[in-house]
Amino acid sequence: MKAVIHNGKAGLLGLSVQDVPSTKPGYGEVKVKLKSAGLNHRDLFLMKNKSEQDPHMILGSDGAGIIEEIGEGVKNVTVQTEVVIFPTLNWDLTENVPPVPEILGGPSDGTLAEYVIIPSQNAIKKPAYLSWEEAGVLPLSALTAYRALFTKGQLKKGEHLLIPGIGSGVATYALFMAKAIGATVSVTSRSEEKRKKALKLGADYAFDSYSNWDEQLQGKKIDVVLDSIGPALFSEYFRHVKPNGRIVSFGASSGDNLSFPVRSLFFPQVNVLGTSMGSGEEFQAMLAFIDKHKLRPVIDRIYPLEKACEAYKRMQEGRQFGNIGIVME
């Protein structure tokens, strides 16, 4: 089967499309013939930090396809079922948070291939109203957004959500989900084009990430910040979050180390919360939520499997708005 392999050199230089053996599912596993898949910033992080001594891996956490073969002991799904892949491994109950969530696409083989073998409980019936391209980019980004907003951020109708750095799959899902429950949404971006797109998709306010936030927000305070930026903007949040507000962190695109006045945290009793990926329970709840509101992913571009390197380059350069998809045929 054809697969997107990372091996050897760090970054995109170690990326190639190769023919690799296709194996059979083991006990409790299913083999899915993939129709589509999606890229995530996590993939870039893995490639950047991989050494030449590390074993090769098939990238990709998101995907959708048709079950072609089932292993012994599988009773919850059948051959020819159309499925979307729940990418988190060994995390079923929301309360049982693992130290570091395991996920498809590093170190275990991922979805940027013609086939993938996964535990049967990770093969979830595909929402019928979604196209293959839409279903393929859905899983990790939508799950991350759902957990960040509702499990961790406890966002409610009428509250004000701030999404710094609009443009990623997670950010666009969060925009749709927040508007679906009746929240007010402000977004930031250095790109005027991305700000305009966000407003067309329903954002209430959009402004430059490095403009004067006091002027832009006009005194409006924030209930929840959904942060993927990290240190570049983090100290700014405390000036605009309401007392007892929530800052939910799921990324660190500008670096790992934070510095902010501690009194700005404890006097207004601001809650800083970390989140990553999500559980099986949350994945089912997310699918029910998007089905209820008939939410669809924003697809930036679709590439054939053979052009995965070109797709990753677009993501690395920060040009995307929404999800970047891969199709197998």
From Swiss-Prot:
Disruption phenotype: Cells lacking this gene show up-regulated sigma X activity. Pfam families: ADH_N, ADH_zinc_N. One of its GO terms (molecular function) is oxidoreductase activity. This is Uncharacterized zinc-type alcohol dehydrogenase-like protein YogA. Keywords: Oxidoreductase. InterPro entries: ADH-like_C, ADH-like_N, GroES-like_sf, NAD(P)-bd_dom_sf, PKS_ER, Zinc_ADH-like. SMART domains: PKS_ER. It comes from the Bacteria. Its EC number is 1.-.-.-. Belongs to the zinc-containing alcohol dehydrogenase family. Quinone oxidoreductase subfamily.
